[in-house]
């Protein structure tokens, strides 16, 4: 070997000695000397080679590892080099206690053993034989470092508010190589995680972070989620887990027992709740008002009808919030009014709408009826009356019925603005010689403007006139006008009294007769005193009397018929009633008396009985027709002429009948007088009224004015009443166009000597035209 090579070798040992911290120069010199001597001996022809060289190895941190180095028959020094630096000479590696040179030295084995591999052992190693001047190939020792235990941020229990998504972060640090992280739930891998790696300062280790997002629908309370980190150092990996704690406000269930329940019975409310975190408070309320006596899960109370519509609420509170739940109770109760119906005031012909609202449980039925009637008008909350009439006025009832529970009703009043309605008794009674009263009851909305009593030629509205006094009293039902007559005489029982009321909608009239009370009472008492046999006897006697009268009437009629055929100047009629119409000067006192007698006779004979009037009208028509067709049977003794009378009677005037606004079916009786003169008299006293007048039959004139009428034949109980109908024009006896027979003075004188009835004018004005007089012969 060349000398410079030896110098280089000595220099290496010097440097090595400094690396080992050898400070004694003498030691190095001795080593150098020894090596030089040994080298000389080895260089004398001996050749050495490696039988074993170090190989690349991978070791997990903390595990032992051995790097092989064997040189057969070499007993010199062996030097182990780590990343270019000598670890020590020979077997002395005291500076690295984790390193040992092992093997049989005599056999040339110089293995390097690392007792516990660490990250700093990760390097390139060489084995060198100094005296033999050989070195091994470099060997790579790779040290694997497992990751630290993975950590899930926020673990081991992660609290999550219900409805929020879950974000988990797991990191595994200080791994070589970098760890791999997977997420597991119930043993299954959860995909969708994201990763990030970070290289540490040593340039060998790495840290990894994984983030997992889970939607709210995939998260369950109490679920465990695992983070597992693995690398080559730990194939089984390391893992950690977290438990999901889903927190939520209370979940409340409110129950009521028993249901359904009758009113005034006890029920129990049970408020059960699940909450995370735990419940801290219960609060009960009804219709927003706190129930102070209830504070726990249960609330017992006695229910009434309000619990059906006003719910009871239970509010449960925990750290996250409150939950409120309400329940009504299926309470059975009778009808309760929620909207009161209102009484109405409407005009005639308008619509009336009533409304009432009820509640009840179970479902109720509503019925509208008019008080006193069994007719159901409506089953709805609303009752509508179209085009109301006066007879629609009255009390209406809204009735509600809850089956098997109860019923209720409300009453309202319908008031109809219209003409007055008089509903007095048409026949009233009084005692002869005593004070008597005739009452006229008037229903009127609006109240009557005027009430007047009229009889004969008298009209009285209020106050006293002679024996007569009028008083008017207002009551809740209507107005009562009373005509009081003092010291009643017989003529008062033969007088027709007229009560008339007016308001802005029209008028109404009632005809009232006064009957003697004593005679009827005596007659009634006599009948009651009679026994049954006496009644039988009277019946037989009456029957016999009637039969006798019928027989006599037949004989008389037969005889009269024979005798009348011989009379001159008389025309025969079908009903054996002869009518003579003559002209006569008025103003006779006797005629006035006769006229009064006729009126009295007509009243005494049934108060204008319908049958008699009908017969007289028919006879008049038939006789007038026959008069027109007859020839003069007296050969000129009587002058038969037709004429036209253009002058109407001034004392009685019938205006065209106007439509009657009064309720139909009301019966009327002729008043026996003209209101034209009455109201003319009233107007002279400064009272201005413009009321349409309707009159039935005038009896204060020599003419009989007849308005076309329809007799109500079904109401025979009151023979003096008949129904007013429309009249197109004024009709009087002087306005007829039929022919009449005019008798001369002689014939009138002879005719007046026979049995007849006369009618004269109320007025005795001699300037008035001749009036015709109706004479009836039987």
Curated annotation (Swiss-Prot):
Domain of life: Eukaryota
Subcellular locations according to the entry: Cell membrane; Cell projection, Axon; Cell projection, Dendrite
GO molecular function: PDZ domain binding
Region listing for Disordered, in residue ranges: 727-778
Nucleus listed as a keyword: no
Any one Gene Ontology BP term: neuron projection morphogenesis
Membrane topology, Extracellular segments: 22-535
Disulfide bonds: 69-127, 170-227, 271-314, 356-398, 440-499
Biased composition (Low complexity): 748-762
SMART domains from the UniProt entry: IG, IGc2
Function noted in UniProt: Synaptic adhesion molecule required for the formation of target-specific synapses. Required for formation of target-specific synapses at hippocampal mossy fiber synapses. Required for formation of mossy fiber filopodia, the synaptic structures connecting dentate granule and GABA neurons. Probably acts as a homophilic adhesion molecule that promotes trans-cellular interactions and stabilize mossy fiber filipodia contact and subsequent synapse formation. Required for the coalescence of vomeronasal sensory neuron axons.
UniProt protein name: Kin of IRRE-like protein 3
Gene name of the encoded protein: Kirrel3
